Amino acid sequence: MSYRKLGRPSDQRRAMLRNLVTDFLRYERITTTEARAKEVRKIAEKMITLGKRGDLHARRQALAYILDESVVKKLFDDIAPRYKERNGGYTRIFKLGPRRGDGAPLAVIELV
């Protein structure tokens, strides 16, 4: 399984992605770098698929990754039912251009 290292040790990378996924599911739209957005998309799609399953085991798996219990509740009660007829492709990434300061390519990731 391939993944992006994002210039961080594994524990910092995992913590950063957990924070980004939690914020993405809370606000349904975030601005970040392209590489981070692509990694967030992979994880967020899996979380939404867990939400669509809707059983206790899926809820516990989501709670193990998502940092905030209220976000898990939103995922299972609000977000997942929206996509019950859709098989994947729950997110969309728009490229914004370079970030002022360091020139990193920015992107917006949002729910479809």
Curated annotation (Swiss-Prot):
UniProt keyword Ribosomal protein present: yes
Highest rank taxon of the organism: Bacteria
PROSITE patterns, per database record: RIBOSOMAL_L17 (PS01167)
GO biological-process terms attached to the record: translation
Keywords: Ribonucleoprotein, Ribosomal protein
Cellular compartments per GO CC: cytosolic large ribosomal subunit
GO molecular function, one term: structural constituent of ribosome
HAMAP family (UniProt xref): Ribosomal_bL17
Family, per entry: Belongs to the bacterial ribosomal protein bL17 family.
Quaternary state and interactors: Part of the 50S ribosomal subunit. Contacts protein L32.
NCBIfam families linked to this entry: L17
Protein name: Large ribosomal subunit protein bL17
Organismal lineage: Bacteria, Bacillati, Bacillota, Clostridia, Thermoanaerobacterales
